């Protein structure tokens, strides 16, 4: 398996860490032979945090090896795709071709989400449609010069974007989940359509809060969709977005993670919700839990270090006591 760390860029706003802490954590990932990627969350006006693009650019400037991406780009459907295409292409150049863009629709229920969407001039019902069209805009600008584009929301002609990304094609993954929505509620039927979209148009897949069995079923479904479309899925990649807390006392590990995640997301997570999103307990507990995902075909995991303690100390335990034995 391959492993990465998801930086807690919202933590800077809620007093859980400093910007320096995040960059030191990225340095530690770069230095670890067991890890190969650095990720960070993304949102605009709900679940506010340091801007993902800016933070990833900062990490790119001090690393040479690790892959870089959002987990996931929740604001993707809200951003101007022409400007974003330019920004992401620049990040790919700065990082020497190490980016993994993970698009997702983002959003949720409630007045704050509605206000965010309205402020960006987008109909909430069209958020996913914007996401898909934005993917097409990015690919168009990254691979063509002076070619017209005629979409539902975006239209242009005689536009050439430079710099182009170093990667050709520059990968765009999609984030979706077959078992839970981002709110943690049981999915009501849209997941099969979302997984079909991954298999048809994405270059990779990110998921979270999914059981090993659910991961296997979703992964097989995506690969079949892609193959049925005539796509070569041999290089199609994925990542499980997860949390981890290593502690000799399993109950203490769960309590520590709950305190962290409740503060981080301004929530009150149930034990069931936490256990869907978290590897925790003794090193042996964590090893066995991750081995179940490995047996289900999961070959890449990115962890948020979910502790109220020192994340560097926790990362040391993860890399020394858990990952070598998975």
Kindly give the residue locations of the regions a language model identified.
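Short, acidic/polar
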Residues: 16-31, 84-87, 180-197, 282-292
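Flexible, glycine-rich active-site loops centered on histidine and acidic residues
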Residues: 2-17, 77-150, 212-220, 308
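Hydrophobic faces of well-ordered beta-strands that scaffold small-molecule active sites
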Residues: 3-7, 36-40, 68-71, 99-103, ...
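Acidic (Asp/Glu)-rich catalytic clusters
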Residues: 27-32, 56-65, 88-99, 197-200, ...
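Glycine-rich, proline-tolerant flexible connector loops at the mouths of alpha/beta enzymes
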Residues: 37-62, 74-75, 107, 209-215, ...
């Amino acid at each position: 398996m391959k492993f990465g760390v998801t930086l807690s860029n919202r933590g800077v706003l809620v007093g859980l860490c400093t910007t320096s802490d995040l960059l030191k954590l990225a340095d530690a990932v770069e230095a670890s032979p067991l890890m190969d990627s650095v990720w960070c969350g993304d949102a605009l006006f709900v679940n506010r945090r340091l801007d993902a693009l800016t933070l990833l650019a900062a990490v790119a400037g001090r690393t040479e090896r690790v892959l870089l991406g959002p987990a996931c780009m929740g604001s993707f459907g809200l951003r101007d795709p022409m400007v974003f295409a330019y920004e992401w292409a620049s990040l790919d150049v700065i990082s020497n071709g190490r980016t993994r863009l993970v698009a997702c629709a983002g959003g949720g229920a409630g007045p704050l989400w509605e206000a965010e969407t309205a402020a960006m001039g987008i109909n909430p019902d069209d958020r996913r449609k914007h996401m898909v069209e934005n993917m097409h805009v990015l690919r168009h600008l990254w691979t063509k010069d002076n070619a017209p584009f005629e979409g539902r929301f975006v239209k242009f002609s005689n536009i050439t974007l430079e710099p182009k990304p170093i990667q050709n094609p520059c990968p765009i993954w999609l984030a979706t989940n077959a078992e839970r929505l981002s709110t943690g509620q049981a999915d009501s039927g849209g997941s099969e359509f979302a997984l079909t979209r991954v298999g048809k148009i994405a270059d990779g897949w990110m998921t979270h809060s999914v059981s090993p069995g659910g991961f296997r079923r979703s992964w097989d479904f995506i690969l079949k969709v892609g193959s049925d479309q005539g796509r070569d899925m041999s290089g199609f990649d994925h990542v499980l977005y997860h949390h981890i807390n290593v502690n000799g006392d399993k109950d203490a590990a769960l309590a520590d993670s709950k305190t962290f995640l409740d503060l981080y997301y301004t929530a009150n997570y149930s034990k069931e919700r936490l256990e869907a999103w978290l590897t925790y307990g003794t090193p042996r507990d964590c090893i066995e839990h991750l081995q179940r995902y490995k047996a289900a075909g999961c070959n890449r995991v990115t962890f948020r270090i979910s502790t109220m303690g020192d994340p560097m100390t926790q990362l040391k335990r993860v890399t020394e006591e858990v990952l070598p034995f998975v």
